[in-house]
Amino acid sequence: MSYVKKDLISTKDLSKDDIFSILSLAKDYKALNLEPVKKDPILKGVTVVNAFFENSTRTRTSFEIAAKRLGADAINFSSSTSSTNKGETLIDTIHNIEAMKTDIFIVRHYSSGAAKFVTKNTPSCVVNAGDGCNEHPTQALLDLLTIYEAKGSFSGLSVTIIGDIFHSRVARSNIYAMQTLGIKVKLFGPPMFMQNAEVFGCHICKDMDEAVMGSDAIIMLRIQLERSDGEVAFPSIREYSKYFGLTKTRMQKAKDDVIILHPGPINRGVEINSDVADDARFSSILDQVENGVAIRMAVLKTIYQNKFKA
């Protein structure tokens, strides 16, 4: 494997070779996951803790399945039933769980930079499972695997990310990784969710038609009102769908072989209509979910083995 760190916090830390190494291992694990016995006990005896301080369905379940298929003991930790509700700090929580001889922390937290902060306070391996508006590296990797499987190469590809760019950790991790791979990235969304988007160095589209046309893959994002603190003047759902939603009519302007991705959860009838999200000709959304397990198996194996290479 090319990647040499014991933590995965940002796709900025991944070289082109790192990305391809992880994707290659993930493809092997995807094949294993089709077998009757879906096990590679490379992490037998290893304790993996899903330390989630935000709600999650796909990511937490995916990491738990990934850890168990590698033979690890996977423990789910939820802040809603923990001593954080009594005032315990993030680091005190990590140190207490670490005292139980935890080997890998999967950290999801509402504060940007939380995962990086944890790495500075524990010798255990750490994977960023989403920190505030900052990053979500394994989501970007599973998106890349999904795109690669559909297109066979990253060469010459154009990918559009549409929606709440400002609050999206998925957008950031994808942008950084795609730029490393030489993929052209276009962005589009309501002005209030495109603040400072020019800093990414991507093409900013002027309307939905431009965003859709010529793209090999389109990543739709939901509006994250929970991160706006009530400061965003959100249009009505009908108005949002009219100007920024992906509909069958808009798909007529897309390439015939375009694929549609969405990190979930989907708000049907808002950023994407059901007849697009469920259309097998375009939708790769469930492929993303399947690929998430394989990617996270690859990441867990890689970082844990790296811990002993230093």
Swiss-Prot record:
HAMAP family xref list = Asp_carb_tr
EC top class, as a word: transferase
Its quaternary organisation is: Heterododecamer (2C3:3R2) of six catalytic PyrB chains organized as two trimers (C3), and six regulatory PyrI chains organized as three dimers (R2).
Q: List the disulfide bonds.
A: none
What does the entry list under GO cellular component? cytosol
Q: What are the EC numbers?
A: 2.1.3.2
- Which Pfam families does this chain map to? OTCace (PF00185), OTCace_N (PF02729)
Concerning PROSITE patterns, the annotation shows: CARBAMOYLTRANSFERASE
User: What Gene Ontology terms for biological process does this UniProt record contain?
Assistant: 'de novo' pyrimidine nucleobase biosynthetic process; 'de novo' UMP biosynthetic process; amino acid metabolic process
Name the source's superkingdom.
Answer: Bacteria
Catalyzed reactions: carbamoyl phosphate + L-aspartate = N-carbamoyl-L-aspartate + phosphate + H(+)
**What is the name listed in the Swiss-Prot or TrEMBL entry for this protein?**
Aspartate carbamoyltransferase catalytic subunit
Keywords of the record, alphabetical order, are: Pyrimidine biosynthesis, Transferase
GO molecular function terms noted in the UniProt entry: amino acid binding; aspartate carbamoyltransferase activity
Show the NCBIfam families listed in the entry: asp_carb_tr (TIGR00670), PRK00856.1 (NF002032)
Protein species of origin:
Campylobacter fetus subsp. fetus (strain 82-40)
Pathway assigned in UniProt:
Pyrimidine metabolism; UMP biosynthesis via de novo pathway; (S)-dihydroorotate from bicarbonate: step 2/3
Tell me which family the UniProt entry assigns to this protein: Belongs to the aspartate/ornithine carbamoyltransferase superfamily. ATCase family.
Protein residues bound to L-aspartate:
86, 169, 222
Q: Which Gene3D superfamilies match?
A: Aspartate/ornithine carbamoyltransferase
Binding-site residues, carbamoyl phosphate: 58-59, 108, 136, 139, 264-265
